[in-house]
């Protein structure tokens, strides 16, 4: 099982120098990938812009959006930006996408909240069409370095999210519940994948939030409550955050036993010491 790490691009206020330093240090420390999360109405960096910067200071690490709320953006823009990052990185991008749960974000861009799932369905088909052109550029920008486009991973636990994995995706990202939440949903995803007649197996990833060192529990709770606001799952995220090295190791072991392909450790603080401590679990 691989272990990647999130970049502190959402830890408020984000610092560009720190984010880029994290990306370079993550690869040097042995993490398999770096990842970013996404919000619109928040003091956070744009996910694909961050990954373009990360691509410039890394050579091997995978680059993940985990996840990007693509229904908030025109599909042609997503296709062009993702293809650009894939080209700049030499084919290291994996595009994790989901619909999100924040009504104000959708109101800000004029997309009806109730239609966000249907918008994503249309986008998934549109991305593949945009990336299928044989020439160097499509109507939506450059052709990706990866033939057919970057792997698309779906976030979410609804029946619709699982359906999208089987119909359009290369895999699934678990965003809630740690290993205890990952294991049963992973089995559901695998079953739906095979029912759809897909070959092989879906890629299965999971996010584990962490904070380490003095006041780790306080720091992580403050960040998660501030970032996610009144979302109904926030307190469960707070309780599930790993705040000691032994808890991080336990989560990694449990995910490994459940058949996870890669765990993404997401920091709740931006100090580089967080990455250095997390690297002790590799």
Residue ranges of model-derived segments:
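Active-site-adjacent structural elements that line small-molecule/cofactor binding pockets in enzymes
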Residues: 1-282
